[in-house]
Amino acid sequence: WFWNDQKMEVKSYVEIPCGIYHSEPDRIRYRGWFINDEVLISHWTAGVSKDYPWEMVFEALLRCGGNLVIPGTDKNSRIYAPIASNMGLMVTHHHAEPLGAEMFLRAYPDLKPSYLKHGDLFDKLWQEAVERQKDEEVIWNIGFRGQGDVPFWENDSAFDTSEKRGELISNIMKKQYAMVREQIPDAVFCTNLYGEILELYREGCLQIPGDVILIWADNGYGKMVSRRQGNHNPRVSALPEEGDKGRHGTYYHVSFY
């Protein structure tokens, strides 16, 4: 096999004993990877093609029992999402690219990425992303971060309090949620409580639709606390509290590029 240089032997037939097999549902419904080291394989062909290493990553995920993938970011996600879907994987999105939309500065490099000034253009990118993926199996990631995976207020200084920041993110999530629901009534949603978003959530400044899966992240070193960079307090708990309702997930870093 590719990852351990195993050579597959072709057999003319395979015997499968007759019988009844009972399989239990997986305890974790959605199980997958984000290819965090995508830049390390983006120019690798393994002597075959640029797609081949990605196909082998997706195959490895399937062999490990996974069913979901974030197939890279930016241009990569639009190249490799169809390959992942064709191999039977569901697709979701990096939290810096809600709904899998194109980054604002990629689409409008000469404009300031301010939702106050250009909200209609952000909405257009999100709507285009919904149209592009509406016929695929997608877990829709909603939220709002700044360009380059930073807090959005680094691009828009008008939002200078937690209340203002949380209100805008909450309103945007509701809008994204409605966009998808209009096209896909039974859509599944998630959002990442990571970095500054975790702080706003803990402060009670975020209003998230009740059926959205809340994804909690470790700090990059395996501890379920706030991110090691850019947070005011690096020890904020990043786990749901006892009695919390709704659905929850974990974004756990095996590597941190």
Regions found by a protein language model. Give the residues of each.
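Glycine- and acidic
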Residues: 38-45, 66, 111-113, 153-163, ...
